[in-house]
């Protein structure tokens, strides 16, 4: 009897990878999040401790504010850049894209340290303006993750729809809001997902650039794990996972919009 190879067997390594490096770690986090550190028994003590401490709530809110601000700023800067690159000649396009990708080849910590030195040199570092310095670092590190998906989406835009909107009497603003944005919505959603979610858990940028004046949620998680308080650290990590899941559900709502529905009405 010959063994018939089926294509479904190709998914086995992928399934094993997900089980070992996604499902099992999440289950471990959930286990530690709802067990007492001293007794090992099931407990909601970490839930109570988290919401009873105002500092935890403040850090969570600050992290969400920075994540939202970083996403908005990256979109405002990255969208026109991606649009310009998508309308450049192919040779110039490749060179400019390379210039934006090149910093990503440098180690994340090295890039952040270089940003700190630059801000200090121009008088904006050293903890003088921690909020501004942190935002600069976040935007610098995550801007390429906005430009690349937007650029890829814009290259696939149907230019005839843009021309048709002008032929039908639409002005530039109407064409942008009613035609271009709907066609590039998949890229916008992808960009927001790739920036907002990592920013929530980021802590190296805020620690280095704000001189530890800005404490984000990721810093708190790192603090508790370094103190060997795995249980409370796991509970905070679980909260972060829930927030990321909520953001994914929100962005999926927009990603389901068909970009071909662009119109003037």
What are these regions (language model features)?
Residues 39-52, 212-225:
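Short hydrophobic, aromatic-rich alpha-helical segments embedded in or entering the lipid bilayer
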Residues 157-161, 259-260:
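Short glycine/proline-centered loop/turn elements that form peptide/ligand docking sites
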């Amino acid at each position: 009897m010959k063994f018939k190879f089926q294509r479904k067997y190709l998914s086995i390594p992928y399934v094993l990878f997900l089980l070992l490096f996604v499902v099992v770690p999440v289950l471990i986090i959930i286990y530690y999040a709802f067990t007492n550190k001293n007794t090992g028994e099931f407990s909601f003590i970490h839930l109570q401790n988290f919401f009873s401490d105002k500092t935890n709530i403040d850090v969570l809110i600050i992290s969400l504010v920075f994540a939202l601000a970083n996403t908005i700023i990256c979109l405002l800067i990255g969208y026109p850049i991606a649009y310009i690159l998508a309308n450049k000649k192919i040779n110039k396009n490749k060179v400019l894209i390379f210039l934006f990708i090149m910093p990503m080849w440098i180690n994340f910590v090295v890039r952040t340290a270089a940003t700190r030195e630059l801000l200090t040199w121009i008088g904006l570092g050293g903890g003088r303006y921690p909020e501004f310095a942190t935002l600069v670092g976040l935007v610098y590190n995550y801007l390429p993750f906005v430009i690349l998906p937007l650029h890829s989406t814009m290259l696939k835009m149907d230019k005839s729809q843009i021309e048709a909107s002008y032929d039908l009497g639409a002005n530039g603003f109407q064409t942008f809001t009613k035609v271009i944005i709907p066609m590039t919505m998949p890229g916008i959603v992808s960009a927001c997902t790739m920036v907002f979610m990592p920013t929530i858990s980021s802590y190296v940028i805020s620690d280095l650039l704000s001189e530890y004046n800005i404490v984000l949620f990721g810093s708190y998680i790192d603090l508790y794990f370094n103190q060997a308080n795995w249980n409370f650290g796991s509970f905070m990590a679980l909260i972060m996972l829930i927030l990321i899941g909520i953001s994914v559900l929100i962005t999926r709502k927009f990603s389901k919009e068909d970009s071909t529905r662009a119109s003037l009405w």
